[in-house]
Amino acid sequence: MDRSVTICVDSEAAALERFAATQLQSYLVKLFDVRARITTASTEKADARFIVGLKGRPHVERSGGGVPNLSDQGHMLRRVADDTMVLAGGSPSAVCWAVYELVERYGVRYLVHDDVYPENAGPFHLAEVDVVLEPVQRTRVMALIRDNPIGSQFWSLDDHKAFISQLFKLKFNAARLGYAASCPVISYEVKGIRRVTGNMNYAQDMPIDDDNIGREHLGLARSVVTPEFEGAETFDEMHAILKHFLHGLIDHAKSLGIYVSMSAHTMEFPTEFRPLLQDPTTTSIQLGDLTCSEQGDLMNPDHVALVSAVFEAHLAEYGDLDELGFGLPEFAYAQSDFRDCWKRLRRRFGLGDVDIEGLLSVTRESGLTAGGAQRAEREFKSFVGSLDFYDRFFAQTGVLERMADKGIRPTMGLNMNSSHQALAFVHRALPENTRFQVCDYAASRLVCKLRWLEKMDPTGLDPIVMTTVQDDNMGWLPQVSTENLHILLQATHRLGWDGFSLQHWAIGDIDPPMAYLARASWDAGATPGAVYRDHFGHLYGERAVEPLCQVMRVLEDATTILSIPLGYFFPVLGVMSRHVRAETPLNDAALHVGAMYEEVRRMLEEVGEDGVLSHAGSRLAYWSSRMTFSIEAFHEVDLLGRGGIALGEAASARARGDEDDCQKHLSQARDYHDRAIRAGEAAVTVAASNVQDPSDRGGIAAYYHLLVREVNRFVREYVAEIFPSG
């Protein structure tokens, strides 16, 4: 006889509490083929009862066996009788997390694009559990938007909503919207100049046609662009679409109780506003040369008016945000008044004890800045300039007060790639109630600077560390940084920081580190190894655990090596041009990484031969295809370099009048170039054979253009340049 199961909620339960009940109902069907009934009568007879709701609800307090004090994120799972389990939370979101925690204990694992169910969950039962969970990392943020073809550029609104829902199961409680300043997020006008430009993907056209490998995965798309933007041409059209799109994301996130922030790019403007700047940047400060910033007096009236307009447009168009971020452009040029700015800051905030010259010296000499010492000094000085500017700007404009009226908290960030020395004093010079965050291009780069985090007093700042589970500078290569993330979170927790913010691009590779982050956010004793063993055991089977842990170790080493030079396969137009023009084969570091990918592929093949769970084959094939993509991409770069050597030899032979030798080397160059292009085609072909999620679609479209279409053109142009007469 079927067992009767009820899920009891309060008659006045909030929508999210009821959602928690329907989620539990759905999982019970999928796991045990049990069709539970949702009821508001907690005393109704049943073979098994789940009491679901907020702490303080009468039915929870009656059944809970003494529900403990719970924070807004705290949740409790307690079997209080043979036939009764209580799932309670300090907020509606936490009630959902109690349900998801129970479902995980039934054997389900949450991936960022799907759920994985156990092959056999066994008979229905109430789990023997009595646990109260409170967060170790109170703020757990994921960037939802990355204006990049291998990130979410190719995702529909529904794709984003599905991603948010999976993050919620992993107990993420905050989301950040982070479009580039060139995107049509806001509309504004200053002194008769109206914003008229806005572009997605930095206006990089990566066309899609019938020649594209993997065309069958790309629908009717004509370029790598979010489906909702197909056909939009004018700024007003794009702005209306993006605004609707962003509000769709915000509404869905908030329906789950997720806190939403947005980066405002308050000191970076579309180029039509250059005439208003006293000394505008004239060299490109970001991809596409679509934006500019002020190099002169930051407090000149027109610059103040522009910054004000950016703030006010965000408050008017996105007034339902919880946080709004401000700061500097990624590539900052606001250093011109550094000395005067520092003098004002020193007086205003009592910073006379800070050795600014010593910090400048460390900035110049650390060698830890991508872009070199010149960038490091320029951006450190620019950060000092921005602290002074925002202090004066907020005092003059009242923007902070208007943000407070809307319940929006200000957030300021610091790029630790270049300005980490400012952590020695920044906590003393921030606007009141401002949250602070730091970032860098890779987790391993942040770990190199942990000692600087120790210098900052976190009191009142609720600081978070922004890091990556993968970095777009390394392109669409498999990346793992779990051990570095572990070191980082252990340090920030010890120092009293509030949490972390993650950036992602493609999502197919990130489940292992995400599993770690989800567990470590609630368990200070969680380690990468322990989480890996649980994760791989449930996804692939026990025999696969040890070799897959070794795979993660090798990939993490490869990621750390790649984080030093950055940029091998950065998904931007022309990225392969320098490889076409190179006259050297792969360097030792790249060869080392390529060999690591080959070893990982071999290890994955052995895992498959030893046998995995019945539902694991496609995931294992996906990982193998990611290795093959990377191996072929590095092979292409190596062959292009060898082709460049052969072209150089051919040119030298012709210069000395040896046409036979010239033709011999030209033939070698053609062979290398042909093989290089075939390697690029092979890379995209294998990726197209294992498409798992929306970011894969963007990846195969973008890298067909970069590794095949553009390389073909670059080779022809380079050969014609060296041998204009043939």
Which residues does each predicted region cover?
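C-terminal non-catalytic alpha-helical accessory regions
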Residues: 119, 490, 494, 504-510, ...
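Extracellular ligand-binding/catalytic regions of CAZymes and related secreted enzymes
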Residues: 106-111, 509-526, 531-532
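Active-site clefts of carbohydrate-active enzymes
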Residues: 332, 452-484
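Contiguous, structured surface segment used for ligand recognition
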Residues: 1-135
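Extracytoplasmic/secreted proteins, especially bacterial periplasmic and envelope-associated proteins
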Residues: 19, 23, 27, 94, ...
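Aromatic-lined carbohydrate-binding surfaces of glycoside hydrolases
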Residues: 10-13, 32, 42-46, 56-63, ...
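Conserved, mostly hydrophobic/aromatic
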Residues: 28, 91, 167, 326, ...
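Generic structural signal for hydrophobic
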Residues: 167, 253, 314, 456, ...
